[in-house]
């Protein structure tokens, strides 16, 4: 055996062609070493005898060494190449598109009547919007770069660029996410969600309509769409999605969450338009209307004019989204029974659930009666969060971990600041006057002229991150021109006031509820904008078509 091993190792390590020694096969019988060696075979009998232990060890060592040498010579080990580190920075093409947009507009000659600062800020603002749409970086990072560019170019001072971080609306939105954390953490969200599923959960459409009309019923009592969306309905909708197996990031968003989030958002702008007290900026519209046409828009007048087109929109929009952006789970006849089993398993409310429920009732009560008590919406939300922090229902570390809240606060405040200074620098006033001169010079009937003004007023909202800012900048000018062209003043004022809410559905920053529902991350940005534009057309057709007939019936024109 030693000879076979040795010869094998030699042939492996040193392949000889013509000079290799061929050993004869040993006889099958056992060898007798005492007999004389008479043949050639016997001369090699020593090779067939057992080797001493020391020699066998050396032979084994030689075999291993020769094998190592052979393998090394036949297939050399390649050098270790470190795995390439993936690029962690911005997506290059979207970044270049954003920069190119800003540079092109920056070097376009400034129109007459526009200041250089206003034009530069418009270039930075549009570049930021393109960046927010294409997302070379997260939204907060893009918005922060936009603010940095405005400060670097001396377009805005640092104080002006970051002034909107003192605005209450971005903070109210961030606080809404903290409330949602407590709502879900305590289990109260699941409890309420299971109750909804038990009552309406046999179909996704029924579940959606139950939320839509619940929000509409609360709208006249809570004069902040941000508070309604963030403090009450976002936590509830998120809990419903999770309870139905629709989660962010695991491919189940379309089971229910995508459709439900988009539906609740789009209908929140409809309910905001239906009542004078349903949105914080609605009284501003009424006040500006009185200053312009000297006619008062009362709560009853507003509701009477808006109720019919509003109800039609609340019915049509969820069903339309159900058809074009459907949930994959449409029917679940066993859901009510399963929800009841879950409720039975949960048992009575825990201490933290009771604290969360009491805090929510306190906050909502202050949102409803806060105007009489001198407490605004964001102050009420801070008070509610303070209760949750003191009682340990929510911890500050958990608030810090809500990255979506801080990201939303950053980009929303940045857009509010830039859009606000576009108005302060006179760009919006210049645009309004230009539109007024153009439409007034067309010589059209008041119906056609008003239709053009309505569309321009509506779709310029892409440049605004606040309904109040849009109303303050353009409402008076467009109402004045409309009446000058023959539009009935009271009719024009109400239509512009209604549209001042509906236009918030265009983007993820156009109204207070937009960043809240978008921040849940169930709907991609491109779809959010695409469906926002589509629903805007539907709403305009309903409010000017069905609404126009209703307003004719009640004598507004």
Swiss-Prot record:
Expressed in roots, rosette and cauline leaves, stems, flowers and siliques. It holds the Pfam family Na_sulph_symp. One of its GO terms (cellular component) is chloroplast envelope. It is a multi-pass membrane protein. The chain crosses the membrane at residues 90-110, 122-142, 158-178, 229-249, 256-276, 305-325, 355-375, 376-396, 411-431, 438-458, 477-497, 531-551. Disruption phenotype: Reduced growth and amino acid levels, but growth inhibition is prevented when mutant plants are grown under non-photorespiratory high CO(2) conditions. Residues 1-69 form a transit peptide. Induction: By nitrate after two days of nitrogen deprivation and re-illumination after three days of dark adaptation. One of its GO terms (biological process) is ammonia assimilation cycle. Its main location: plastid. GO terms for molecular function: alpha-ketoglutarate transmembrane transporter activity; malate transmembrane transporter activity; oxaloacetate transmembrane transporter activity. Keywords: Chloroplast, Membrane, Plastid, Plastid inner membrane, Transit peptide, Transmembrane, Transmembrane helix, Transport. It is found in: Plastid, Chloroplast inner membrane. 2-oxoglutarate/malate translocator involved with DIT2-1 in primary ammonia assimilation and in the re-assimilation of ammonia generated by the photorespiratory pathway. Imports 2-oxoglutarate into plastids as precursor for ammonia assimilation. 2-oxoglutarate is converted to glutamate, the end product of ammonia assimilation, which is exported to the cytosol by DIT2-1. Belongs to the SLC13A/DASS transporter (TC 2.A.47) family. DIT1 subfamily. This is Dicarboxylate transporter 1, chloroplastic. It comes from Arabidopsis thaliana.
């Amino acid at each position: 055996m030693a000879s076979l091993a040795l010869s094998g190792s030699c042939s492996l390590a040193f392949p000889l062609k013509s000079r290799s020694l061929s050993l004869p096969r040993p006889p099958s019988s056992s060898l007798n070493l005492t007999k004389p060696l008479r043949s050639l075979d016997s001369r090699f009998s020593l090779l067939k005898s057992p080797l001493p232990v020391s020699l066998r060890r050396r032979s084994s060592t030689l075999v291993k060494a020769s094998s190592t040498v052979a393998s090394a010579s036949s297939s050399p080990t390649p050098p270790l190449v470190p795995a390439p580190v993936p690029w962690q920075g911005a997506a290059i093409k979207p970044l270049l598109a954003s920069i190119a947009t800003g540079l092109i507009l920056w070097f376009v000659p400034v129109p007459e009547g526009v200041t250089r600062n206003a034009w530069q800020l418009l270039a930075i603002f549009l570049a930021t919007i393109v960046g927010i749409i294409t997302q070379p970086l997260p939204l907060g990072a893009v918005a922060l770069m936009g603010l940095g560019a405005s400060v670097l170019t001396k377009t805005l001072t640092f104080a002006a660029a970051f002034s909107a971080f003192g605005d209450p609306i971005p903070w109210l939105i961030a606080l809404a996410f903290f409330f949602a954390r407590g709502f879900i953490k305590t289990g109260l969200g699941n409890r309420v969600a299971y109750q909804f599923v038990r009552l309406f959960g046999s179909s996704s459409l029924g579940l959606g309509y139950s939320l839509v009309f619940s929000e509409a019923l609360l709208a006249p009592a809570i004069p902040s769409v941000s508070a309604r969306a963030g403090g009450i309905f976002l936590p509830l909708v998120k809990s419903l999605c999770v309870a139905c197996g629709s989660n962010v990031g695991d491919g189940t968003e379309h089971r229910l969450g995508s459709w439900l989030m988009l539906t609740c958002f789009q209908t929140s702008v409809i309910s905001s338009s239906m009542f004078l007290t349903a949105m914080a900026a609605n009284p501003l519209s009424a006040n500006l209307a009185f200053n312009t046409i000297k006619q008062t828009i009362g709560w009853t007048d507003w509701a009477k004019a808006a109720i019919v087109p509003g109800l039609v929109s609340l019915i049509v929009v969820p069903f339309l989204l159900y058809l074009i952006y459907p949930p994959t789970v449409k029917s679940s006849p066993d859901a009510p029974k399963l929800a009841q089993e879950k409720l039975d398993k949960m048992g009575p409310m825990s201490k933290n659930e009771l604290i969360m429920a009491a805090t929510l009732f306190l906050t909502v009560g202050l949102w409803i009666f806060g105007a009489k008590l001198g407490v605004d919406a964001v102050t009420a939300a801070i008070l509610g969060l303070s209760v949750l922090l003191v009682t340990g229902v929510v911890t500050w570390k958990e608030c810090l971990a809500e990255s979506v809240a801080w990201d939303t606060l950053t980009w929303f405040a940045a857009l509010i600041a830039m859009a606000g200074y576009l108005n302060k620098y006179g760009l919006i006033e210049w645009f309004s006057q230009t539109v007024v001169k153009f439409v007034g010079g067309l010589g059209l009937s008041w119906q056609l002229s008003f239709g053009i003004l309505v569309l321009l007023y509506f779709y310029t909202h892409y440049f605004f991150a606040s309904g109040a800012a849009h109303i303050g900048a353009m409402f008076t000018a467009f109402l004045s021109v409309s009446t000058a062209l023959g539009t009935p003043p009271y009719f024009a004022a109400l239509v512009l006031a209604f549209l001042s809410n509906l236009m918030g559905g265009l983007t993820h920053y156009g109204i207070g509820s937009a960043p809240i529902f978008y921040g849940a991350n169930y709907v991609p940005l491109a779809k959010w904008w695409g469906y926002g534009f589509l629903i805007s057309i539907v709403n305009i057709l309903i409010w000017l078509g069905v609404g126009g007939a209703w307003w004719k019936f009640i004598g507004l024109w």
